[in-house]
């Protein structure tokens, strides 16, 4: 029988943040697209990790799992007659890809996966570039999106710039972030740029958030390869080479 705590590599008393952090790390590690040479095992692991996160990230499901195991979620145990399970007819797990997309908010996590450890090493714990602890999923996306985790850091007028050189992780060569804007509902603009080498090619990802609109540009060796606005990929007109 699979132990969901073992799948995520966390203790039974793990906090919700611990569970989110574990899922993020393992989902990126075992995503089938990142393991083409070992796709069958990756798909199995990816599915297990998604199932474990789905159960342990939900207080009600986690409580039932702690008491009755996976059987409780399936409405088992003699037809559920000896306990009151809200999943009497069985709990249906979602598609692991849907869990993955929802967790990362529809963004491409692979272009930012190097945020996980280097920042933790620099600050001793998970902190945003301005030193304020990121909230939400615990990923760094919230720190650059102009949503709640950044909001509390702004006074009537605030500017910020952060830049890192090579961190020796995942081929990262540089990362920079600038942000400025007025207080309250005034204009806000955040720009973050990351550059890394992948198979000898220079991949630059630029994320611009302004007045609630998010624009993500990905360039390969200086040539624009993809453009996403508010999570929707735009068609590129390749008039030039």
Curated annotation (Swiss-Prot):
Key words, A-Z: Chaperone, Cytoplasm, Methylation, Nucleus
Major localization class: cytoplasm
SUPFAM superfamilies hit by this protein: Chaperone J-domain
Interaction with HSP70: annotated span: 2-146
GO biological process, one term: chaperone-mediated protein folding
Modification sites for Omega-N-methylarginine: 135
Compartments (UniProt record): Cytoplasm, Perinuclear region; Nucleus; Cytoplasm, Myofibril, Sarcomere, Z line
Listed Gene3D superfamilies: DnaJ domain
GO CC aspect terms: nucleus; perinuclear region of cytoplasm; Z disc
Spans traversing the lipid bilayer: none
Occurrences of domain J (ranges): 3-69
Chaperone in keyword set: yes
Tree of life domain: Eukaryota
Chaperone recorded as keyword: yes
MF (Gene Ontology): Hsp70 protein binding; unfolded protein binding
Region described as Interaction with KRT18: 119-241
Role description: Has a stimulatory effect on the ATPase activity of HSP70 in a dose-dependent and time-dependent manner and hence acts as a co-chaperone of HSP70. Plays an indispensable role in the organization of KRT8/KRT18 filaments. Acts as an endogenous molecular chaperone for neuronal proteins including huntingtin. Suppresses aggregation and toxicity of polyglutamine-containing, aggregation-prone proteins. Also reduces cellular toxicity and caspase-3 activity.
Assembly information from the UniProt record: Homooligomer. Interacts with BAG3, HSPB8 and STUB1. Interacts with ALKBH1. Interacts with HSP70, KRT18 and PTTG.
Protein name in the entry: DnaJ homolog subfamily B member 6
Source organism: Macaca fascicularis
Name of the gene encoding the protein in the UniProt record: DNAJB6
């Amino acid at each position: 029988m699979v132990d969901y705590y073992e799948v995520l590599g966390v203790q039974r008393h793990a906090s919700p943040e611990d569970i989110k952090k574990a899922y993020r790390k393992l989902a990126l590690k075992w995503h089938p697209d990142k393991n083409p040479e070992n796709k069958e095992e990756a798909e199995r692991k990816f599915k297990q990790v998604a199932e474990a996160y789905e159960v342990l990230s939900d207080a009600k499901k986690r409580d039932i799992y702690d008491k009755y195991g996976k059987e409780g979620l399936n409405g088992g145990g003699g037809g559920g007659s000896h306990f009151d399970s809200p999943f009497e007819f069985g709990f249906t797990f979602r598609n692991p890809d849907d869990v993955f997309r929802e967790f990362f908010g529809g963004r491409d996590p692979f272009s930012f996966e190097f945020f996980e450890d280097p920042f933790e090493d620099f600050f001793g714990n998970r902190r945003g570039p301005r030193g304020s602890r990121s909230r939400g999923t615990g990923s760094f996306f919230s720190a650059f999106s102009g949503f709640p985790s950044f909001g509390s850091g702004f006074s009537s007028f605030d500017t910020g710039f952060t830049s890192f050189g090579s961190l020796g992780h995942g081929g990262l060569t540089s990362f920079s972030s600038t942000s400025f804007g007025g207080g309250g509902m005034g204009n806000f603009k955040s720009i973050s740029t990351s550059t890394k080498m992948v198979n000898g090619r220079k991949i630059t990802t630029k994320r611009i958030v302004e007045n609630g609109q998010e624009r993500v540009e990905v360039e390969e060796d200086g040539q624009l390869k993809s453009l996403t606005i508010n999570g929707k990929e735009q068609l590129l007109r390749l008039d030039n080479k």
